[in-house]
Amino acid sequence: MAQWTLLIVFFCVATAAAGLSFHDSNPIRMVSDMEEQLLQVIGESRHAVSFARFANRYGKRYDTVDEMKRRFKIFSENLQLIKSTNKKRLGYTLGVNHFADWTWEEFRSHRLGAAQNCSATLKGNHRITDVVLPAEKDWRKEGIVSEVKDQGHCGSCWTFSTTGALESAYAQAFGKNISLSEQQLVDCAGAYNNFGCNGGLPSQAFEYIKYNGGLETEEAYPYTGQNGLCKFTSENVAVQVLGSVNITLGAEDELKHAVAFARPVSVAFQVVDDFRLYKKGVYTSTTCGSTPMDVNHAVLAVGYGIEDGVPYWLIKNSWGGEWGDHGYFKMEMGKNMCGVATCSSYPVVA
């Protein structure tokens, strides 16, 4: 067994040394020196080289032969999902990303939060004004959207949606960018019906920040991606919340008005199996739900537009900059797709 473990580690290290990436134009030539060793482990397959490129690009490490074979099998199954979906010529395409060797069950466990009832949005308090909305909006162009972050193996999406909204509100109000602490929310916001790496809601996080006295910076309270003891220090507070504005459940007209004229808005929706492999285009689904108890992932709506005649929401995710369209995705607008307008709110900062 030790011999096989060494072989697997060598495979990963050797590909990294070669500087190979998943998009290299001639990967077969570059991996030919190790191809024979790789095939000894996973057997001859038309997906072997693709798997080698994938493992190198995303720094995959498999400790045993059985684990490597298992991941290769999952990878091959996900390739088939990508291929069959893209053949349908939908408004979006799937592609290989760092989740391509994960099962749906693993993904759901590590990346998604438990469903929670968004009671705060049963009756919203955002006021629509009688004004013509711009045809499209992208807050990134105004320099107030912070960089895409990665929540890691923790169902803390709600904290990244919260900090993303606050970082944008802060930049809008004070003219400078800031990176805020997700870990403080993971560790300290439990009294407001949040559950750290097991899920939570931005609306409840805004309440915690308001009554706790503020949120620290990322630098002062860095992210670990694990549940921990609360280490909040008031001296390090960087932003305070005066209150939050909730969008009425399912009211996409309110949400669009808020995104157009207020600022980026925290939203939540239901992630289903194929979404984890999203690459580009306007995502739509016939299998996701749209009730408050369906939504399982919080993100940040930063704009909207129209692509090939289909209106969409432009949304910032928290799965890293290599996922999707540079960390972003587009979701069809007008149908409350996957519950995107079911649980929406934005903060007012001080």
Curated annotation (Swiss-Prot):
Entry keyword set: Disulfide bond, Glycoprotein, Hydrolase, Lysosome, Protease, Signal, Thiol protease, Vacuole, Zymogen
Swiss-Prot/TrEMBL catalytic activity: Hydrolysis of proteins, acting as an aminopeptidase (notably, cleaving Arg-|-Xaa bonds) as well as an endopeptidase
GO cellular component: extracellular space; lysosome
Entry-linked SUPFAM superfamilies: Cysteine proteinases (SSF54001)
Record EC number: 3.4.22.16
InterPro entries documented for this protein: Papain-like_cys_pep_sf, Pept_asp_AS, Pept_cys_AS, Pept_his_AS, Peptidase_C1A, Peptidase_C1A_C, Peptidase_C1A_papain-like, Prot_inhib_I29
Enzyme class: hydrolase
GO terms for MF: cysteine-type endopeptidase activity
Disulfide bonds: 154-197, 188-230, 288-338
A biological process term (GO) from this entry: positive regulation of apoptotic signaling pathway
Active site, per annotation: 157, 297, 317
Location of this chain's protein in the cell: Vacuole; Lysosome
Role noted for this protein: May play a role in proteolysis leading to mobilization of nitrogen during senescence and starvation.
Family the UniProt entry places it in: Belongs to the peptidase C1 family.
Subunit structure: Interacts with KPI104 and KPI106. Composed of a mini chain and a large chain. The large chain may be split into heavy and light chain. All chains are held together by disulfide bonds.
Protein name, entry field: Pro-cathepsin H
Organism of this sequence: Medicago truncatula (Barrel medic)
